[in-house]
Amino acid sequence: MASKNLFVLFFIFALFAANIAALQCPKNSEVRNSPCPRTCNDPYGQNSCITVIRETCHCKGELVFDSDSICVPISQC
């Protein structure tokens, strides 16, 4: 019984720790599980893919990352 309680406590701690370490994205962006962020140089995200699918920041809507990693409309690139 003690080992079961210990496992439950460890599981709760792991969930809590995962939430603390959550990715913080810049203004006008959000976390997604897509490997291909859109940028001024690659507005469709076809050439900027990372090899591992993981949570990364992506600009919201029709915005793209500029060279300073700020989400801007494509017209401002």
UniProtKB/Swiss-Prot annotation:
* Domain of life where this protein originates: Eukaryota
The residues annotated as site (Reactive bond) are T51, V52
Q: Where is the signal peptide?
A: 1-22
Predominant location category: secreted
Localization per Swiss-Prot or TrEMBL: Secreted
Which InterPro entries does the record associate with it? Ser_inhib-like_sf, TIL_dom
The entry's keywords = Disulfide bond, Protease inhibitor, Secreted, Serine protease inhibitor, Signal
Q: Name one GO molecular function term.
A: serine-type endopeptidase inhibitor activity
The yes or no answer to whether the keyword NAD is present is no
Cystine residue pairs: C25-C57, C36-C49, C40-C77, C59-C71
Query: Which tissues does it occur in?
Result: Hemolymph.
* Family annotation (SUPFAM superfamilies): Serine protease inhibitors
Which GO CC annotations does the UniProt entry carry? extracellular region
What this chain does, per the entry, is described as:
Highly specific for fungal protease and subtilisin.
Concerning its family, UniProt says: Belongs to the protease inhibitor I40 family.
What name does this protein carry?
Fungal protease inhibitor F
Species this chain originates from: Bombyx mori
Taxon lineage: Eukaryota, Metazoa, Ecdysozoa, Arthropoda, Hexapoda
